[in-house]
């Protein structure tokens, strides 16, 4: 299981811990990932994804998973999210 958001592609970043005496030690900044089940209105079922807290807010802001995936770039999405995006597009075309 990778430490990467399935919707935005956010992953670990590197930087320094800096002490009061300005001593620097390397560290990793990990994304705030959560396992969530988002409801797809088009598919009529839940989709389990591992996404960041920022991505969850973005999904709510855009009006749900279907609207978020419609505007999302394919290169940012994981294989699972890309599969769901194609399922949604196919279901919307059939309806």
UniProtKB/Swiss-Prot annotation:
It holds the Pfam family Ribosomal_L28. Residues 1-22 are annotated as: Disordered. GO terms for molecular function: structural constituent of ribosome. Gene3D superfamilies: Ribosomal protein L28/L24. InterPro entries: Ribosomal_bL28, Ribosomal_bL28/bL31-like_sf, Ribosomal_bL28_bact-type, Ribosomal_bL28_sf. Keywords: Ribonucleoprotein, Ribosomal protein. GO terms for cellular component: cytosolic large ribosomal subunit. One of its GO terms (biological process) is translation. It comes from the Bacteria. Belongs to the bacterial ribosomal protein bL28 family. This is Large ribosomal subunit protein bL28. It comes from Ruegeria pomeroyi (strain ATCC 700808 / DSM 15171 / DSS-3) (Silicibacter pomeroyi).
